């Protein structure tokens, strides 16, 4: 609850900023405390029964990615109506309301861990050092989210330029296609509960690679781009849900620490994907962006091929 309110405070600072330094401060605070959303995932996994844990994780993660994608649509519409500050004013109010809802609805749980904070951080590294499957899944998450960022970072550049020349609001509507793909990935958690996580991962990574063909055709066809967005977001979310369902089985008493390590890797991939995408667009346009996406998708398949035998043991 406290972190949600602090994230809302960061948005208020950004909305009222009169200088670049003030905007950076507000954005940094929002980014720092918005990780509260990731705390809800291991909490939900802890409250769920073993037979439904994957399904529950899938539901929570679908909601998270849905928020990421629909935020683009809503932000575009709000920016058209009242400017960019309106986006942050509205978002801060919604976060404050969410804090109230969490305060009223979250159960009170006691932790069985008696480690201090430095020891907790050290134990995260220890988990990764001693568990090869955890490292494999974290790397898969890193690379899949890099694929996601490669597409979404440069897609706005493509749609704003000729021959499309779309407005901010119109570009934001493409988030609806991604949202549909994210919702379609929800059953992945159920498949993982049934011991089929290796199949969902293999199928998902192959589809991820194939999605870049439609995305490449998107430089001349909006329909092809929408199909590519649907498939890519479906596979990214499906693999992500499967990853989390698998790692939560490994150390049930350390789900928060597993989430901390896994999501750190995940967001590093997202940040790297954004940098790669912007650079590829600058130097080689949409073809360069698609080549970067294909390369990362192939790396994903290589990582999975090398770690596949470890997944069979978990199933």
Which residues fall in each region the model found?
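Helix-to-loop junctions at the C-terminal end of transmembrane segments
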Residues: 183-197, 281
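Paired small-residue
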Residues: 10, 18-29, 223-231
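Helix-loop-helix hairpin linking two adjacent transmembrane segments in secondary transporters
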Residues: 22, 59-106
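Cytoplasmic helix-loop-helix junction between adjacent transmembrane helices
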Residues: 26-63
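Flexible cytoplasmic inter-helical loops of multi-pass small-molecule transporters
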Residues: 103-126
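Helix-breaking motifs and short loop linkers at transmembrane-helix boundaries and internal kinks
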Residues: 14-18, 218-219
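C-terminal transmembrane helical hairpin of 12-TM major facilitator-type secondary transporters
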Residues: 198-243
């Amino acid at each position: 609850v406290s972190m949600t309110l602090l994230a809302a405070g960061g948005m208020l600072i950004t909305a009222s900023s009169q200088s670049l330094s003030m905007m950076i401060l507000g954005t940094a605070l929002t980014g720092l405390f918005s990780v509260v959303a990731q705390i809800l995932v291991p909490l939900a996994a802890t409250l769920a029964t073993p037979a439904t844990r994957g399904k529950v994780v899938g539901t929570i993660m679908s909601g998270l990615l849905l928020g990421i994608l629909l935020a683009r649509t809503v932000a575009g519409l709000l920016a058209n109506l009242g400017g960019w500050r309106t986006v942050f004013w509205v978002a801060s109010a919604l976060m404050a309301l969410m804090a109230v809802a969490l305060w009223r609805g979250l159960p009170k749980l006691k932790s069985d861990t008696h480690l201090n904070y430095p020891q907790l951080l050290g134990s995260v590294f220890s988990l990764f050092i001693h568990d090869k499957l955890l490292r494999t899944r974290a790397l898969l998450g890193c690379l899949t989210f890099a694929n996601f960022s490669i597409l979404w970072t440069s897609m706005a550049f493509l749609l704003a330029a000729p021959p499309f020349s779309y407005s901010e609001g119109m570009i934001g509507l493409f988030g609806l296609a991604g949202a549909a793909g994210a919702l379609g990935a929800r059953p992945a958690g159920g498949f993982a509960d049934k011991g089929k996580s290796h199949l969902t991962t293999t199928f998902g990574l192959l589809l991820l690679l194939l999605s870049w063909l439609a995305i490449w055709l998107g430089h001349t066809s909006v329909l092809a781009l929408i199909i590519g967005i649907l498939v890519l977001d479906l596979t990214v979310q499906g693999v992500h849900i499967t990853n989390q369902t698998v790692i939560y089985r490994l150390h049930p008493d350390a789900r928060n620490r597993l989430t901390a390590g896994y999501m750190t890797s995940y967001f590093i991939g997202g940040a790297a994907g954004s940098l790669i995408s912007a650079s590829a667009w600058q130097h080689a346009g949409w073809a360069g962006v698609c080549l970067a996406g294909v390369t990362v998708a192939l790396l994903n398949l290589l990582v999975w091929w090398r770690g596949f035998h470890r997944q069979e043991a978990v199933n």
